[in-house]
Amino acid sequence: MLGYQRSSWAGNPANPYDTTRAASLGSSSGSGVSVSANLVMCSLGEETRASTRGPANHNAVALILPHKSLLGFNGGAIGADIYCDRAGILARTIDDAAKVLDALRDPDRAYYDPRDPYTTVPRSSVLSTPYATHTGMSGASGSLAGMRIGVIRESMVIRPVEKATVPICTSAAAVIKAKGMDPFLR
């Protein structure tokens, strides 16, 4: 079950591009709406299941959803499930979201948070360089040469009426390959 958007202060949030539509069912829909409507540059949300992915998708904003061992979450945030909850960074561009992620890095401890047991895992999955430096890559052919990305179709829940989404995944993999990256499909 997803979180629901609700506000006793000003009513429920609506999609800023079409106010007759919901901003999504994610509990961080206000975060997505505020970024999409240019009220703020970025917003932090909490995700248990799809509370930041839904608002990012429905409001056309970028999202960085770090894994639990990258960004500490046990510093006072209220979540529904300690095993699933994590922070999401919503912004107008992926570059802005990466800059926020870099700003959340502690100068002494990096991304380690002594209050969060998940950040004590091996740090091999954390870049030593700022994340924002990796968002400025050119879109020219071959710019992604040597990189690999996985398109895992088994995890995509596609109902029979949504078979039209299958060609989208295949064409996205073709675009990735044209940029020089090695997509592997499963």
Annotate each PLM feature:
Residues 182-186:
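General small-molecule cofactor/ligand-binding pocket signal
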Residues 1-87, 115-120, 152-155:
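Short glycine/serine-rich loop/turn segments
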Residues 174-175:
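Alpha-helical scaffold elements within enzyme catalytic domains, especially in hydrolases
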Residues 65-167, 171:
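A short helix-breaking turn/cap at a secondary-structure junction
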Residues 179:
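Conserved dinucleotide-binding and phosphotransfer motif residues
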